[in-house]
């Protein structure tokens, strides 16, 4: 299977922070069906924490509006019955200038609609950065058709990440993860004829092929899955990559202006900084466990969720460290970037109290 793609070409795209699924290597695997393939990615910048706990993250790939666009696509003039799920790239890159050789982690591609880890895990692997290569990447294959009209069948395919070895005095951005999915509306059960029903995997860089303690690793992956959520919110700024590409006319020969166009890569860029993911989960992220009294759950779930969703939407539009967040029925609240749940609660309480005084209500 290694001969199917040029691995060094994909590794080079990882080094340049380019899209793996936007590569010609992926287009070649689809052959004549390449122009029908939808390509989606999500890029997340994730924070470390001052407590030194493991960083945990979960993310979905396809948004609800994107899925609807895919459903609307016709196949030879007919509505598609299936959505073929193809390739999933996962690339993790350090955003730290030093100490990268101490960073390692676990990653899993799972189906969160299942109840047991052994049936849910599509693939799992461990990785370790090096001083010369502070990044890791792997290309996975799902190669399965699901019901295109079933939201759960598509939305339950998610990535789980656990990062270790990050020590900080204060919270800061420590890493970026890019994952994606190629999918094709179809009325056929087999689409990738070069691999038939096989599911090859390509370790691109710094993937640990043999773990030291398999039982401990298995238990850790089970814990990751058991802690996952099936209810994530779609957010992020949209970006289009690898536009204007065409399929080769003869063999690998691509002539500018000729050949059928292939679709560009749709990427969502987002950050997990400053978001309480128990309530706002466009990604679900944890940097330390909170006691129940600290978690904000005693403080009106609906109210906290509503406010934090507004905060997340505003944060997705801005990359500054100092911003204004507006919530319905609340006065403008200043968020500086270091608030705890209690800080947010106090600010909202004061804003509500002030609003009530202005209107003569309680």
Swiss-Prot record:
Keywords noted in UniProt: Host-virus interaction, Inhibition of host innate immune response by virus, Suppressor of RNA silencing, Transport, Viral immunoevasion, Viral movement protein
GO process terms (BP): symbiont-mediated suppression of host innate immune response; transport of virus in host, cell to cell
Presence of the UniProt keyword Transport in the record: yes
Pfam families for this protein: MP
Keyword NADP included in the entry's annotation: no
Protein purpose: Suppressor of viral-induced RNA silencing.
Protein name: Putative movement protein
Originating organism: Citrus leaf blotch virus (isolate Nagami kumquat/France/SRA-153/1984) (CLBV)
